[in-house]
Amino acid sequence: MNKERTSCKHTRAEGTVTRKILAKQKEFLWPGHILYYKEPVPLDYGCGSWVTDVEGVRYLDFFGGILTTSVGHNHPKIVDRVCAQAGKLIHSSTLYPHANHVSLAEKIASITPGKLQKSYFTNSGTEADELAVMAARGYTGNYELLALRHGYSGNSAIGKTLTGQSAWRVESNIVPGFKHAINPYCYRCPYKMSYPSCDLACAQDVEEVIQTTTCGRIAGMLVEPIQGVGGFITPPPGYFSRVAEIVRHYGGVMIADEVQTGFGRTGSKWFGIEHWQVEPEIMTMAKGIANGFPMGNTVTIPEVADSLVGQGHLICTFGGNPVSTAASLATIEIMEEEASPDVVHAKGVKLRKALDSIGENSRIVGEVRGMGLMQGIEIVADKKSKTPAPEVVDEIFEKTRLKGLLIGKGGMYGNTIRLTPPLTISDDELDTAIGALQEVFSET
């Protein structure tokens, strides 16, 4: 599995295979697909922290398929478990119980905070969030929900309505019943205040939104502990505990969207919301849960799950799929053995120290933020004006690719670099990525 198929070559010429793939992409796939890089990179092979494109060029993957390949590409344990399960039973639906399904639910109950215990598996984070909305409404008897500005919840009608960025919303798909509060974006505080003297004014906005734009009773509030597509915006201490008090006061439940922050990604804890000492009634998860196999999950306290009995049938054709659950069980085992939250924390400290140094010596770095191996760099025209500079992000993207490093980007203004390597990344690989970033920022 670890044998290299090619040496590291970063001067890439677009070959015949690439041209054929991109031509078919244009002809047969929706044009709305977002492709990274001026010359898109069709991938052919992955191993550990590395991927190789169809032209034989090898890259260090520092974005992990959007925070999904938690334990690296093609980990032998996952490959073995998946192959064994595929030779035994590929599909069951939720109509028939099987060992992987219940074992994974039991495992998740053991690592999630508080009373979270009852799982319902689906196919994606979007589905998980939709199910969370339904569960919150069914449990509380209330209809309206809150989310945060700059948040992101996926491609469905409810997912796009929960999303707090106009670029990701589709007018014809917006549905009623959702309100958005100010997000805890300290770097660009709309109140022009600073933590802690601000006394968490952004958290107080949640109550103002409830009082002025809803009927005064809500089903809940869905929040990402660290906003993913929003640019890794990281709330200050105390923010979520204050928000939880407000939400529960008005009859709602807290929904933690851990699609990007879950499974040790933020270091020290299994789930991001734990850093703020909040125990949600509902939690959603996907992406890194199965290292690339399609899966979403909505886990609730027993009272929420029990309240839905008799409120309509639930079935999911691909939910709890035997192969995906086998992959997920193996993924969590690997995390426990090779990339525990404490191990991720240590790696995150190393990465953050290097990024802070880059930021101190660069005129274009406005802020470095995040936790663990979920780090963001907000790029600006200059530190004083804080003017977003998405065009500079594009320049950095192309330069890092030429150095054999694949990174991510995001943020409301498209000016945040997102760095999320596999949790199993080695120290040497971290050094390689840091070195490439240092070189690029010194040139930019």
Enumerate the language-model features and the residues they cover.
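Conserved N-terminal phosphate-binding loop of PLP-dependent enzymes in the Aspartate aminotransferase
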Residues: 2-444
